[in-house]
From Swiss-Prot:
GO terms for molecular function: 2 iron, 2 sulfur cluster binding; electron transfer activity; metal ion binding. Residues 4-96 form the 2Fe-2S ferredoxin-type domain. Binds 1 [2Fe-2S] cluster. [2Fe-2S] cluster binds at residues 42, 47, 50, 80. This is Ferredoxin. Belongs to the 2Fe2S plant-type ferredoxin family. SUPFAM superfamilies: 2Fe-2S ferredoxin-like. InterPro entries: 2Fe-2S_ferredoxin-like_sf, 2Fe-2S_ferredoxin-type, 2Fe2S_fd_BS, Beta-grasp_dom_sf, Fd_pln. Ferredoxins are iron-sulfur proteins that transfer electrons in a wide variety of metabolic reactions. GO terms for biological process: electron transport chain. Signal peptide: none annotated. It comes from Arthrospira platensis. Its cofactor is [2Fe-2S] cluster.
Length: 99
């Protein structure tokens, strides 16, 4: 099992934290364990409440069923069903940008 550094940022929310996240742990779960309060609703990859955008690194969100290919190509990630596959940086609270 690998552990990656996941940096979560959002200037408007005052978030700039780097957390450790195992490659078999969802990023949202690791953030909550680290004491961060990120938005979420379904926790199943079927809505957009937890959406963020990945600015560097790679993730696996194959469990999600909400985002279309264009949104994924644009860097959107559902943190509730995303595993890190490298060190990465994610901008949080990006649901509004999807619409």
């Amino acid at each position: 099992m690998a552990t990656y550094k996941v940096t979560l940022i959002n200037e408007a929310e005052g978030i700039n934290e780097t957390i450790d996240c195992d490659d078999d742990t969802y990023i949202l779960d690791a953030a909550e364990e680290a004491g961060l309060d990120l938005p979420y609703s379904c926790r199943a990859g079927a809505c957009s409440t937890c959406a963020g955008t990945i600015t560097s690194g790679t993730i696996d969100q194959s469990d999600q069923s909400f985002l279309d290919d264009d949104q994924i190509e644009a860097g959107y990630v559902l943190t509730c069903v995303a595993y890190p596959t490298s060190d990465c940086t994610i901008k949080t609270h990006q649901e509004e940008g999807l619409y």
